[in-house]
Each structure stands twice: as C-alpha cells, then as structure tokens.
Swiss-Prot record:
GO cellular component: extracellular region
Role summary: Binds to muscle nicotinic acetylcholine receptor (nAChR) and inhibit acetylcholine from binding to the receptor, thereby impairing neuromuscular transmission.
Cysteine pairings via disulfide bonds: 3-24
Source taxon at top rank: Eukaryota
Cell compartment(s), UniProt: Secreted
Classification via InterPro entries: Snake_toxin-like_sf
Lineage of origin: Eukaryota, Metazoa, Chordata, Craniata, Vertebrata
Organism annotation: Micrurus frontalis (Coral snake)
Name listed for the protein in its UniProt record: Frontoxin VI
Family: Belongs to the three-finger toxin family. Short-chain subfamily. Type I alpha-neurotoxin sub-subfamily.
Tissues expressed in: Expressed by the venom gland.
Keywords, ordered alphabetically: Acetylcholine receptor inhibiting toxin, Disulfide bond, Ion channel impairing toxin, Neurotoxin, Postsynaptic neurotoxin, Secreted, Toxin
Amino acid sequence: LICYNDHGYTGKTTETCENGETTCYEKSR
C-alpha cells in the first residue's frame, strides 16, 4: 500500500497505514 495523509503522499510504502494516514491505495506497479 502507498500511504497518504491529509497533506498528500507520506513517502511510505507499507502493508498497513498508521493512524492519521487516512487514505491508502494499492500499488499499481
């Protein structure tokens, strides 16, 4: 997953997103 927060991309790719990272997208590639 690619983690995003209210400000945009967090720069992290993890299996789970932390609290406050409200939107997660599956990696497209």
